[in-house]
Amino acid sequence: ALGQGLTQDAARDLGLNVGTPVGAGLIDAHAGGLGTVGAAGPSQGAQSRMAYVFGTSACTMSSSDNEAFVPGVWGPYYSAMVPGLWLSEGGQSAAGEAIAQLVRFHPAYAETLAKAAEAGQHLLEYLLEHIADVVDQPSDAMLLAKDKIVVPEFLGNRAPFADPSAKAIISGLDADVSTESLIGLYVAGITGLGYGLRQILKVQTVAGIDPKLVVISGGAGEHPIVKQLLADAAGIPIAEPSAAEPVLLGSAMLGAVASGVKQSVQQAMTDMSSLGRVYAPSSGDIAQRHLLRFQA
């Protein structure tokens, strides 16, 4: 806890009691990391998991017992997120925004946007509903991309190349102006982000940071099909947290420790969070297709 808790002025302004314990705050991504990677379940332990915050941009956070310098990945920072552990932080400068930019390029964008509005849906919600209607299994959605491959580096590469001058690449376009073609481009964009995540995982493994599970949060990754596509493209299980707002949960954990309800941040992470569904990466033909696209 910080100092003697809330001062008289702060307590009055907030409508709380003087002396209410105050925990040291964290940036939003780090608070989200606390709220996701410590839950009981498969690959338990912050060192065995990567937090992937998938919003307008994306942030990856991996914890390790020892300092590991990873090219193109920020850190390591000691006790920056989990006390006593080293934090390595990567990410993608454009993630959800990259997908939004990508679909705007397609000739069917305006027409499909109007159809989505007529149905009372957000465009991406509309596309995902159509994907669910035409595939037997979520992993099969990658087949809708056909020959389209996307490197969604519209704002450069944050990790693992740390290259602000990197540009996006869209390969495999044809003359198809249908909504189905737009769906294929969208799927190619999601898998492109997954391949970017795979690159980060790969360089971290070489440096000795080898998470076995990615825990995803953020608005851009809420749909089950998106989570499955990312798991398949990155080649690693992806879990969803049970909490709808893990950033707020992580902040609550800090408050619990400051107030003495929990004895340590690690205890709060284990006791106050849990995992939901885990999406296992595909095998067989789908996995081989993703590997070839990643290598391309």
Predicted regions and their residues:
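Conserved phosphate-binding catalytic cores of ATP/NTP-utilizing and phosphoryl-transfer enzymes
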Residues: 8-16, 26-49
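Glycine-rich nucleotide phosphate-binding loop and flanking beta-alpha elements
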Residues: 33, 37, 58-60, 222
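Glycine/Thr-rich phosphate-binding loops that ligate phosphate moieties of nucleotide
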Residues: 1-5, 9, 23-24, 60-296
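Short, well-structured active-site flanking segments
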Residues: 45-49, 53, 262-265
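Active-site-adjacent loop/helix segments that line or gate small-molecule/cofactor pockets in enzymes
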Residues: 29-30, 55, 293-296
